[in-house]
């Protein structure tokens, strides 16, 4: 992609987060980080699945095999209708992210202990998810 196209997409994502009720720049970055992390762990899970397929050896997965855990993957919620996506992300995906690391003393766990998801507008969240997917 051309740099100006990427810049415009990033700017639109930023504006969509603001439209979702987050106005402080550090909070915009924080909320985008949560969403990008959700996308990244799904991509990592896909890499694990491919390694498992190619090697024939069982790998350690991020997500369980149950339908409920698979629903937490970016690829499985990115196309949801706005209200359903917002409810699913806030009630299930974000909680999963917060509890992902079982080591309560890690920096990751300490940081996420008091984390809150602040994009309050379902349509704004849907636009941000779509924007991140299109980058």
Over which residues does each language-model region extend?
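Non-catalytic, mostly N-terminal accessory regions of nucleic-acid modification and defense proteins
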Residues: 1-135
